[in-house]
Amino acid sequence: MLKSTLSWVDFSEHDRDHMLQVIRIFAEPETVDELGIGSVRDALADVLFPGTSTIQTRAAYFLFIPWIYVSLEGRRASARDVAELARRREVQLIDALAASDDTRGVIGIEARSKLKRFPSSIYWNGLGVWGIRRFPGSREQYHRSFASSPVGPGTVLTNDDGEPADGVVRWNWHPALPDPPPGFPRRASFRLRPDDADFLQERIQSSAPNSYLAFLVGEGGIFSPETVLFPWQHPRTAHAPELNRRQLAHARNFSLVMHGAALCYNLLLVEARLALRQTDADEERRDTYVDMLEQWWAEVKAWTRVVQQWDMTSFWATAEQGNPNIHRRTRYFVETWLAFVREHLRGGHPVDRLVRSQRVVDLLKERERQLKGSRARFYNPHALDGWNGRSGADRLNYRWPVVSDIVLDILNGFAEGEFDAATG
């Protein structure tokens, strides 16, 4: 059997970041995008929380990476040497964070020097989106730039005669980047200083001033992530700008409506496998999905007016702000499923009638066939037999677990300054 491998060409870091998110998603059974709606989910997440990704962890990495690279600037070196120097310092950073009093979210805490993808790669695109990274290319291109000429903060661009080119100054990193704390990276912590928090807040609000993320780091206030499980549950959502509230409403509606499609898909798969062989595990799964669908339908009915009046033209316009290339088949699938939900709401039907509708069954089977081809479980007994029993059955949260950590890190950085002032 041929071994499948991935080889990275010189992608933009955004493309690479997206690909790694896809790989991670397919490694996590509960978040697998079985119905091909991930492009819509990610588009909405980019609108709400620009610069973030599911493979990020803590806000301080938006400072750690520039600090490491700024410390390397001002020297002439090969791309390989720069990459190795940066790698060593990132390993030092891992060790320092692992020894700190807050190890949650330390990237590479287990792998250490054997880590395959370092934080500099994970955060590179987000650093550009927030305007912290001014260098316009990929991380590899940045490494190569060291070989052509010593790069450094405030480097003056020159013309072919070696003279200043119109007084242009090239900044690879934002000139207001705070200095690292003493001993970095051998000593490091996720705890932000007030100046760190202020810088990150300013970068978010300047680079994405109309985003919900900008509102959260500015006026959102401290909240409990244990009780705020989705972005629209934030206690200050009602105080957000009208644009953000509209975006959140679209995200909430999409999450609610499409959750039913995912649950229905899982139930139909379990029943298809039970038709081939009876197992206690699958019978328990079937009962679980039936219960989850009942709960979902009760919630949908509670939101009947919202679901029936949901403006899909406005929804797609919002999603297109994050991704203008959402496939027409994805649009068709979403709108057809929504039409079935609305039809059954109008008729006052129980959820079982929706699930047993042949049109619904055909829609889900055809969607899986479009996405998986010969590997579609509805048509491939071997694939069905190897299924783990749960695929993409969770509600869409638009990276909220990661985003909430980043937001709270920044807000707690301001609180740290207030505490120091009060006790000083």
Residue ranges and their predicted role:
Residues 1-424:
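Non-catalytic recognition/regulatory regions in large multidomain proteins
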